[in-house]
Amino acid sequence: MYKLVLVRHGESEWNKENLFTGWTDVKLSEKGVSEACEGGRILKEEGYSFDIAFSSMLVRANDTLNIILCELGQSYIDVEKSWRLNERHYGALQGLNKAETAEKYGEDKVLIWRRSYNVPPMPLDESDKRHPIHDSRYKNIPKSELPSTECLKDTVARVIPYWTDKIAKAILEGKRVIVAAHGNSLRALVKYLDNMSEEDILKLNIPTGIPLVYELDKNLKPVKHYYLGDEDKIKAAMESVANQGKKIDR
């Protein structure tokens, strides 16, 4: 039996402001730092330790991981970072307020942009400074692979090869693995692991900073999964994620 721990980064400054973030590199909020500390504390209390960690190229996930590893006294373990674990790219929506966008275009349309499996938002033009081709951290990645926008299907297409080539390989080698990433890159992985339908994945809300444990059999098929922490807090956190795209109350 293997165990895999997944953690969505703690609340970021743009999460706090309810903005579409995507590949924009935004730091953790004060609350996000606290969430990461709490996640690390819970993992320590439950006796978890790790041999290798995987994360994205974005600071909010990297800092969450660093805080957790510090709480565990394991800052020394190997960390592998990849753009394939980045958040879904939200195209021209990046930087816009989710609730105000819902007021302008309607909740149904924003829900489709946020959560549909195969409908991406409007793309960024390559001349836009927000496009990842202008970010030096991606200079070694072919321009053709860097997205202008993504739907969840696109995110799955880049996450799963990384799971197979890197993460699953490490687990099968007997390494204890933690992955600190993002709401949609983790949803892509959960969809694959649990063989979820396109419809069911739309309803999945992964809360920030709360460790999600998967117990896997010898073929890396899930036996069960569960969050660590207080059940009421977990439920409230999941509801908070679900409410992000709703219109502003007047």
From Swiss-Prot:
GO MF term list: phosphoglycerate mutase activity
Catalytic reaction(s) noted: (2R)-2-phosphoglycerate = (2R)-3-phosphoglycerate
Domain of life (superkingdom): Bacteria
Pathway: Carbohydrate degradation; glycolysis; pyruvate from D-glyceraldehyde 3-phosphate: step 3/5
EC annotation from Swiss-Prot or TrEMBL: 5.4.2.11
Chain positions recorded as substrate binding sites: 8-15, 21-22, 60, 87-90, 98, 114-115, 183-184
Active-site residues, as the UniProt record annotates them: H9, E87
Alphabetical list of InterPro entries matching this protein: His_Pase_superF_clade-1, His_PPase_superfam, PG/BPGM_mutase_AS, Phosphogly_mut1
Record site feature (Transition state stabilizer), residues: H182
GO biological process: gluconeogenesis; glycolytic process
Keywords: Gluconeogenesis, Glycolysis, Isomerase
Job of this protein: Catalyzes the interconversion of 2-phosphoglycerate and 3-phosphoglycerate.
Family note: Belongs to the phosphoglycerate mutase family. BPG-dependent PGAM subfamily.
Protein name stated in the entry: 2,3-bisphosphoglycerate-dependent phosphoglycerate mutase
Organism: Borrelia duttonii (strain Ly)
Gene designation per UniProt: gpmA
